[in-house]
UniProtKB/Swiss-Prot annotation:
Keywords tagged on the record: S-adenosyl-L-methionine, Transferase
GO process annotations (BP): nicotianamine biosynthetic process
EC assignment: 2.5.1.43
Family: Belongs to the nicotianamine synthase (NAS)-like family.
Domain of life: Eukaryota
The keyword NADP is annotated on this UniProt entry: no
One Pfam family it belongs to: NAS
Function comment: Synthesizes nicotianamine, a polyamine that is the first intermediate in the synthesis of the phytosiderophores of the mugineic acid type found in gramineae which serves as a sensor for the physiological iron status within the plant, and/or might be involved in the transport of iron.
Stimuli inducing this protein: By iron deficiency.
Protein name: Nicotianamine synthase 1
């Protein structure tokens, strides 16, 4: 076995061991043991590695799928815990830095906006939808406060309790960012005419856990979004043990033109895919040598510097944020 194969085997074995330990936990609610295991997992998955999760053995693929579901459940419990904690403050939005990964949301949302601005010039959406917003809708909050100050945000989640927690966070800011936020308990598969109202739809990484589920969600969006509307999808190709991977071809088959694919460096975990609802002429096949229609993926570099190397301590606690980042 050559050195690279040994490295791949060692990493898969390590992650499988962490997955087994997480699966045996009596609860995924925040605790020292839960925090330790997930810190170990993220520390193992973030550095660049030669592992291609699409080529895992069936056994390891089942392990990966089980791990992603555990990550999803734990993330939900972590966000619910901190949503309840933040709700105890008179001004919850002044204390967002208490959440240990808040800085990651700041950087990810900035990245998504700058990719949109680069590939959809002049974009100034009146309404956007965020599908899979959860109890701590940090992404919508950062986008609304720092990048899209005139935009109305409709946040969708399957969980009514998650939406109730989110509403409490904005209750004290009804005349500010909160005035542009609404929360809806719904399955995206049940949305039809509503989707035609949005200039941009953001699809969270954990909406559609399996590849088939994700492709079905994207196809549904493609059937009901208006031509020219933008779709921002979170994927995780370099960190595919943490989140589902989205194949750009599934986005094309769903009726979209893929504008850009960005894989993260440093602290940002998720890959980002920016697409646009295609017009009928584009859906019929390649036109005038269109590279996107032929299937060429425009892999792009980051629009700003996100290449700072993450240190282990950043996984255990949030980096100290500037006053500007917390001023809502």
């Amino acid at each position: 076995m050559d050195a690279q194969n040994k490295e791949v085997a060692a990493l898969i074995e390590k992650i499988a061991g962490i997955q087994a330990a997480i699966a045996e936990l009596p609860s995924l609610s925040p605790s020292p043991e839960v925090d330790r295991l997930f810190t170990d997992l993220v520390t193992a998955c973030v550095p660049p590695s030669p592992v291609d999760v699409t080529k895992l053995s069936p056994e390891h693929q089942r392990m990966r799928e089980a791990l992603i579901r555990l990550c999803s459940a734990a993330e939900g419990k972590l966000e619910a815990h901190y949503a309840d904690l933040l709700a105890t403050f008179d001004n919850p939005l002044d204390h967002l830095g208490l959440f240990p990964y808040y800085s990651n949301y700041v950087n990810l949302s900035r990245l998504e906006y700058e990719l949109l601005a680069r590939h959809v010039p002049g974009i100034a959406p009146a309404r956007v939808a965020f599908v899979g917003s959860g109890p701590l809708p940090f992404s919508s909050l950062v986008l609304a406060a720092h990048h899209l100050p005139e935009t109305q945000f409709d946040n969708y989640d399957l969980c009514g309790a998650a939406n109730e927690r989110a509403r409490k966070l904005f209750g004290a800011t009804a005349d500010g960012v909160g005035a542009r936020m609404s929360f809806h308990t719904a399955d995206v598969a049940d949305l039809t005419q509503e989707l035609g109202a949005y200039d941009v739809v953001f699809l969270a990484a954990l909406v559609g856990m399996a590849a088939e589920e994700k492709a079905k969600v994207i196809a549904h969006l493609g059937a009901h979004m208006v031509e020219g509307a933008s779709l921002v999808v979170r994927s995780a190709r370099p960190r595919g043990f943490l989140y589902p991977i989205v194949d750009p071809e599934d986005i094309r088959r769903g009726g979209f033109e893929v504008l850009a694919v960005h894989h993260p460096e440093g602290e940002v975990i998720n890959s980002v895919i920016v697409a646009r609802k295609a017009v009928e002429a584009q859906l019929s096949g390649p036109q005038n040598g269109d590279a996107h229609a032929r299937g060429a993926v425009p892999l792009v570099s980051p629009p700003c510097n996100f290449s700072t190397k993450m240190e282990a301590s950043a996984l255990e606690k949030s980096e100290e944020l500037t006053a500007k980042e917390l001023a809502f």
